[in-house]
């Protein structure tokens, strides 16, 4: 029915042809779908939903397939609905700092589209060059800047969603009643198909600097995270890496990470020049016990320091093509103990 209703180029069938869609970034679990459909417009999405409903076929929505939770993994005999071709930036409202997007727009493409207006989109997952905004909403993605600027849920103003019946719903932050907009964020495609996203944009900061601090122990590095927050600083980005991650990222990206460090902390500060300098003075005092301290001296150097961290996932993939990666949530007060325990288990 799908082949009859839609032109051949957007329906993929056959075991070998659908292999690329049998998993997302969580590659330890795999399941081939019955077929994959790559619609080119919303009407085709509605057609697919109608046909699948009539035939009682499960539908699994897919963005770019970079997620790490298995959210885009097909069910047995399911139809994968890939939305990568719906990739238009529909409108940009500079005055109100909003952008209306189709779900297949890549995360990094949002900031590229509004850069000329001095704006950008804050959430920046490590897969931002490939991941889609629809997938970001489905996974409630974060990124290195989520500490200060929030997750996807904090940066989405409205959604247009299709139910399995093909009904179109508009969910907005301005709606009264139940928080359905927030509910859709992180729902992994289970509650509806996201066909349009309105995101908020923020002004590019006057200045941004990254402090790179190397430590002789994971515990000292983890304690530094808590100390920075305790000092009243909310960094634009705050990320730590252990020795294995440092070696993997440096081998892949070659950005100048110190390979003799047991742990590395990247702390980004942004704002006006005066704000950044004041916060930088405080952070450097907090990090005075680090074995190495370096502050980015240019925008290119700042981006390079983050490039290494954002390369960690593909870097480890180069060492082991099949590995298990999940996000964990650890209270800051337990971070040092948890990381030391993980290192102990790794040695075993």
Go through each PLM region and give its residues.
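Soluble FAD-dependent oxygen oxidases
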Residues: 31-59, 98, 192, 198, ...
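FAD-binding subdomain of flavoenzyme oxidoreductases
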Residues: 88-241
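Generic beta-strand/beta-sheet core signal
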Residues: 14, 62, 82-84, 124, ...
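C-terminal substrate-recognition/cap domain of FAD-linked oxidoreductases
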Residues: 13-19, 203, 209-348
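N-terminal flexible segment immediately upstream of the FAD-binding catalytic core
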Residues: 1-50, 67-97, 126, 243-254, ...
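Acidic/histidine-enriched ion/cofactor-binding microenvironments in catalytic or ligand-binding pockets
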Residues: 51, 153, 257-261
């Amino acid at each position: 029915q799908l082949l009859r209703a839609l032109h051949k180029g957007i329906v993929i069938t056959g075991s070998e042809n659908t292999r690329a869609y049998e998993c997302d970034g969580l590659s330890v679990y795999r399941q081939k779908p019955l077929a994959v459909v790559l619609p080119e417009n919303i009407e085709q999405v509605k057609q697919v939903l109608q046909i699948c409903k009539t035939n009682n076929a499960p539908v699994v929505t897919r963005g770019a397939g970079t997620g790490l939770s298995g959210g885009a993994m097909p069910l047995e005999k399911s139809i994968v609905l890939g939305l990568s071709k719906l990739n238009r930036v529909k409108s940009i409202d500079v005055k109100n700092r909003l952008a209306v997007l189709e779900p297949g727009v890549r995360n990094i493409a949002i900031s590229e589209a509004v850069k000329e207006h001095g704006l950008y989109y804050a959430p920046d997952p490590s897969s931002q060059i490939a991941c889609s905004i629809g997938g970001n909403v489905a996974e409630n993605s974060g990124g290195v800047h989520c500490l200060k600027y929030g997750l996807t849920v904090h940066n989405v103003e409205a959604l247009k969603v299709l139910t399995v019946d093909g009904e179109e719903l508009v969910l907005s932050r301005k709606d009264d009643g139940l928080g359905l907009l927030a509910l859709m964020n992180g729902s992994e495609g289970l509650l509806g198909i996201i066909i349009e996203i309105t995101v908020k944009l923020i002004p590019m900061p006057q200045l941004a600097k990254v402090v790179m601090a190397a430590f002789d122990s994971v515990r000292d590095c983890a304690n530094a995270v808590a100390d920075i927050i305790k000092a009243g600083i909310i960094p634009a980005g705050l990320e730590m890496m252990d020795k294995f991650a440092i070696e993997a990222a440096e081998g892949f990206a070659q950005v100048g990470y110190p390979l003799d460090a047991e742990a590395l902390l990247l702390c980004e500060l942004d704002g006006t020049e005066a704000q950044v300098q004041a916060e930088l003075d405080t952070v450097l005092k907090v990090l005075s016990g680090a074995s190495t301290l370096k502050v980015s001296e240019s925008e290119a150097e700042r981006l390079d320091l983050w490039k290494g961290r954002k390369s960690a996932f593909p870097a480890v993939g180069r060492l082991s093509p099949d590995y298990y990666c999940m996000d964990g949530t650890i209270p800051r007060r337990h971070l040092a103990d948890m990381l030391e325990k993980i290192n102990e288990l790794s040695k075993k």
